[in-house]
Regions:
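C-terminal scaffold of the Radical SAM
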Residues: 1-183
Length: 183
């Protein structure tokens, strides 16, 4: 959603004129909360986009801040409401586990909050910290201890991450969601 909507429209029109696109094809775009406007959503629909994937990551503003995200939960809610009001009937919400300072209870609170919104899809995945990324640089030990790795005391341990994963499966299944990917 950072690209200008007219550029997205032009690209998708070129795709449609160059290839056979099934009438019921799912055409999705990733959106960051706070970067979407009603105008963008209308152009997206005109371009044939019928599915939004919104990168919420957490309903907890402290976790969002720890991730370096530029949005708040309230900004996400405004984006979600704009999408529903624009007529989008196929919305995915991304949630992340394994975040700094995150506990099972905090994650489940985010998950239940998202379930109450009734999105068509929920993508729940675990944070993977890649060496060389800004996130890795932000959370590694001081120069003397760099080789030891990350500040593991602020990240959930493997057992907690596994408990979150299993609880996520159970909660989503009970809420009527079907797992079709593991990441």
């Amino acid at each position: 959603s950072w690209l200008e909507e007219n550029l997205i429209y032009t690209v998708l029109q070129q795709v449609a004129s160059s290839f056979h696109v099934e009438a019921d094809a799912e055409i999705s775009i990733e959106c960051n909360p706070g970067t979407v406007t009603a105008k963008k959503l209308n152009v997206y629909q005109s371009a044939g986009i019928n599915r939004l994937s919104i990168g919420l990551q957490s309903t907890n503003n402290e976790e969002l801040k720890a991730l370096g995200r530029i949005h708040t939960y309230d900004q996400f809610l405004k984006t979600y409401e704009l999408a529903r009001n624009a007529g989008f009937e196929n919305i995915n919400i991304d949630l992340m586990s394994g975040l700094p300072y995150q506990t099972l209870d905090k994650f489940l609170e985010s998950l239940q909050t998202v379930i109450r919104l009734k999105p068509e899809h929920i993508s729940a995945y675990s944070l993977i910290i890649e060496k060389g990324t800004p996130f890795y640089e932000r959370y590694k030990f001081d120069a003397v201890k760099q080789e030891a790795g990350l500040h593991t005391e602020i990240l959930p341990d493997e057992d907690e991450v596994y408990r979150i994963y299993k609880a996520t499966q159970d909660v989503l299944k009970q809420a009527g969601y079907r797992q079709y990917e593991i990441s």
